[in-house]
Amino acid sequence: MDVWKRQRLQECRELCPLPVLMSLSNMFSKIEIVYVKYLFKMDFSTMYRYILPALTLSMTVTKSLVIEMLFILKRWEDIDQFFRLNIRKVNDCFIVAQFNHIPIKRKLIVLLYMLTSRQEKQLFLNMIYAFLEKSHLRLGDDEEQNAIRFFSYVDDLHLTRDILLEMIHKLKNTEINQTMELLLSYNELAR
């Protein structure tokens, strides 16, 4: 591995500075906060003044962890602004692809939610109902509550990665299928 790559990876293993965590926390929308809570298994009902500094209470928050989260949330400009990694450049993208702190299933479920329309989300839930004969979940009008209910419901089912991917492919959403393939190939790279 090139010296500069090793240096960048070493840099990313450092703790993320508190001012960066606070700045990023202020930039998140309400729905992005729900995504962050799900990615890190935080309590949905607890309100945090700053979501990312709250993570430091239960885990070591490195730059790489934050970069991985921002990558999933498609906040690529923030990765560039705060960490000088432009994921549109192959070398920088190689660095970002090394991070795999967040379980792949959680990443897939957040991306599924982010990249699908309300009808596609409901179709996914209907497929779960048909496949597993579990109680039916109907989405309402409140996007924040929908996300919380969706994540909790899907988590309770303990779907295997393969079943999850099979159902996602059945949605026939080109963007989400391409994103899943990309994420899975990055995950393989990081091993």
Curated annotation (Swiss-Prot):
Record InterPro entries: Herpes_U15
GO cellular component terms attached to this protein's record: membrane
Primary subcellular site in the record, as a coarse category: membrane
Keyword Transmembrane listed: yes
Transmembrane segments: 50-72
Membrane topology reported for the UniProt record: Single-pass membrane protein
Keyword annotations: Membrane, Transmembrane, Transmembrane helix
Subcellular location: Membrane
Listed name of the protein: Uncharacterized protein U15
Gene label: U15
